[in-house]
Amino acid sequence: MKVKICGITDVETAKSACEYGADALGFVFAESKRKITPKRAKEIIQELPANVLKIGVFVNESVEVIQKIADECGLTHVQLHGDEDNYQIRRLNILCIKSLGVTSERDMKNAQRYETDYILFDSPKEKFHGGNGKTFSWELLGHMPKELRKKTILAGGLNALNIEEAIRTVRPYMVDVSSGVETEGKKDVEKIKQFIIKAKECSK
């Protein structure tokens, strides 16, 4: 099971997550409690192992700005959390993840129309797109087509206590966590470690 730790804002946490086995780190460039500047993200990314994916999170940003930040920072993927469409996705010269909030099985079916490398299923948006710490009914994704499952990233309120059930129900390619590995709004390296251990163990 691949694991992504999202909302990285400092190099110490980023390095610790990599040491504990994180496969991907997320950097939020949209409005969020975890927003980071391109300059700071680049500084962190330069310190990371080459095999760890570096994913930039954007919401309704222009293709030009997304591509510029991706190139400057050394991102490997971009994650689109807004109302982006296939026209915008096709114009991006980088691997792409489209995020969708899940309220019904229809959302899973709608995901198949996006011409993207991965689909991230998340809880419905609130004040911020993602990182709200709330789960959704994983059973809605239980009858996912095999081809879609192979490129599914599961997010939304995941933590060390519920990750086993989430993986067992959805069987995604990757799981994505942010608030579930925080204490009082800050990344907690011990929670990151425990989350990664649980996610990797229950997928063996």
Swiss-Prot record:
Gene3D superfamilies tied to this protein: Aldolase class I
Pfam families assigned to the protein according to its UniProt record, in alphabetical order: PRAI
Pathway: Amino-acid biosynthesis; L-tryptophan biosynthesis; L-tryptophan from chorismate: step 3/5
Amino-acid biosynthesis listed as a keyword: yes
E.C. designation(s): 5.3.1.24
GO molecular function terms attached to this record: phosphoribosylanthranilate isomerase activity
Name of the protein in its database record: N-(5'-phosphoribosyl)anthranilate isomerase
Organism: Bacillus cereus (strain B4264)
Lineage summary: Bacteria, Bacillati, Bacillota, Bacilli, Bacillales
